[in-house]
Amino acid sequence: DSAPRAALLGHSHMDTAWLWPTAETVRKNARTIANQLSLMEQYPEYRFLQSASCHTAWMQREYPALFERMREAVAQGRYEMSRKTDGNQAARCGWNATAIWWAARR
């Protein structure tokens, strides 16, 4: 099918330790991810886009069970990772470029 497609993704912008301690960012991030995974259970068509790879590393270290749930959702194509491009680079899709999350491939 060559028809154009569009998708809506859930997204939560989580500043990394902006005006609060890093430990609070880790906790808030875990709660946000857990909520997104719960939404995926409720709504099979729901997709989520995460925009900070350091948050993934924190989940792997601090919340391993949650990290495994994230990996499962990535493998299902329901949880996407994004990274911000360098502000000096021209990105065709704007300031965010979708990247492949390595953990889904392991």
Residue ranges, per PLM feature:
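Carbohydrate-active enzymes and regulators
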Residues: D1-R106
